[in-house]
């Protein structure tokens, strides 16, 4: 770290120096100490806020500078981190382990309930996906061409999803909190700016919950065809561990959704079967959501975006109700993003690299892919998307 880094203000906007805030080596929102703790009435119970933090607290109802990193209903607590437009842009994902902001504020849910009940719902769009399908790239492209605040995989969605599944909580209480969390996430920096929430793939069940809550919510579901999804799951050890974990999360839920009494039980290394079950489960979730007959719910094969990136990104912006930025060379921005895919400034990945990786994986793991095709056809039956998913964006 150079001398400039040592003395510069932290990009989170906390008012502290970078090396004393988000620049502390090894610090994340998970392991950072709580800087400010509020009482149930909103008064400061612990810590001394900087003027910048006090302003963020005072404007929390309208300004997203304090972002809900985690909401723990069982503990009656919520934790927020100080953010800024730059820090949102640099945060590949917004879960506590990877979000850039590490200045932590803690409150009770009693206080949050009062605050959220005063926050108006502002139209917000969602991107759901299967994983390995360019959803992060789409969020970046929307930010480059439109007035857009992309929220990439906020854990708060998973927190409310888990809460909704709690049978001990009354439905009306769960729905009230669902609305509060959605309104909290819908805050933006200026009225023209549209919020686009790119959900974690865990959160695909929320598609139906959202449509019940507000049938007009715009949604895009991104996916890759099964063979490419399987190739993405098996091409490296970290990916194989990933699909094992994902399979374990849905294996108890998938039979009812897929109407399969006898669900295949993959062996420990049957990654193709695990991928087929997880992919089929998510495709079935989309098809269930399509039953709401919302014109605002569309699907997109990642390959179509790679073939026609500018047209697809513009069509997505229109679907999601975003306003184009003025004075932007859209083609140049798209060429920059798609010429070298970059999740952030430390990650570079070209389309040629992706194509070679997929081609190699399709060849090397043909047995996994062939088995996956058999399993997915069994699980989805006539609903297997031979010609792509319904409601295509283009």
Where are these regions (language model features)?
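Short linear Ser/Thr-Pro motifs
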Residues: 14, 135, 342-345
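Acidic/negatively charged segments and metal-coordination signatures
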Residues: 1-43
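Short, charged/polar micro-motifs that form catalytic or ligand-binding hotspots
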Residues: 11, 125-132, 196-200, 272-276, ...
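A generic secondary-structure signal for well-formed alpha-helical elements
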Residues: 25, 29, 146-149, 320-324
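PAPS-dependent sulfotransferase catalytic domain
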Residues: 32-292, 296, 303-326
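A polyampholytic, Gly/Pro-enriched intrinsically disordered region
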Residues: 169-180, 239-254, 346-356
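PAPS-dependent sulfotransferases, especially Golgi type II membrane carbohydrate sulfotransferases
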Residues: 33-116, 258-275, 283, 287-293, ...
